[in-house]
Design a protein with these regions (language model features):
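Long, contiguous alpha-helical bundle segments
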Residues: 1-143
Length: 143
């Protein structure tokens, strides 16, 4: 299960990195007035970055689990007769399974939140300055 979760986390980080780069390259320079679309684009960019950072921390927590498990197993091999080390490994595995289930739910939430933000504000992300008519009606920005 952790292998597939790790692959999903890696996919999310890669997808968000591409989106972050795309938004950054499409961001015009700030000028006086008519920067509403740019501010929307900046808000979306900060959400993308936050989602990417969350995914990276999830990946690091999975790596920490493997390190902790290996450390306990090494102690278990040195002290073969102590049952508490076996229980510790089992407890660590159960804890990680619960965390992995939560990670999957968190990944889903990150994808949904970012998709919602992007779909609702796509015209501002794609063309933040827009045409003169679009600049006059900026009341349809969704948070």
């Amino acid at each position: 299960m952790l292998t597939s979760v790790k692959l999903e986390v890696v996919d999310l980080v890669e997808d968000l990195s591409v989106l972050i780069s795309w938004v950054r390259f499409n961001r015009p320079k700030l000028e006086a007035g008519a920067n509403f679309g740019v501010s929307v684009q900046h808000d979306v960019l900060s959400n993308l970055t936050s989602g990417r950072n969350s995914a990276i921390s999830v990946y690091q927590s999975i790596a920490n689990y493997y390190f902790s498990r290996g450390r306990v197993i090494r102690k278990m091999q040195k002290n073969v007769g102590i049952e508490d080390y076996r229980r510790s490994v089992l407890s660590l595995d159960v804890k990680q399974f619960v965390e992995a289930s939560q990670i999957v739910a968190d990944l889903r939430s990150i994808y949904l939140m970012l998709a919602d933000k992007l779909f609702k504000n796509w015209k501002y992300v794609e063309a933040p300055k827009g045409s003169k008519q679009e600049r006059q009606s900026r009341s349809d920005f969704y948070m």
